UniProtKB/Swiss-Prot annotation:
This is Fungal defensin eurocin. GO terms for molecular function: lipid binding. Keywords: Antibiotic, Antimicrobial, Defensin, Disulfide bond, Immunity, Innate immunity, Lipid-binding, Membrane, Secreted, Target cell membrane, Target membrane. One of its GO terms (biological process) is defense response to Gram-positive bacterium. Beta-D-GlcNAc-(1->4)-Mur2Ac(oyl-L-Ala-gamma-D-Glu-L-Lys-D-Ala-D-Ala)-di-trans,octa-cis-undecaprenyl diphosphate binds at F2, G3, C4, H14, C38.
Length: 42
């Protein structure tokens, strides 16, 4: 979701918009699904 899989930039922007000290995000989850989960990083 939120750009994943395939658009890590959109995921990162989504995480930054959430605030709370989040610096961005990356696509995570099962590799065979193309990393479908947007995971925020702090």
């Amino acid at each position: 979701g939120f750009g994943c899989p395939g658009d890590a930039y959109q995921c990162s922007e989504h995480c930054r918009a959430l605030g709370g000290g989040r610096t961005g995000g990356y696509c995570a989850g099962p590799w065979y699904l193309g990393h479908p989960t947007c995971t925020c990083s702090f």
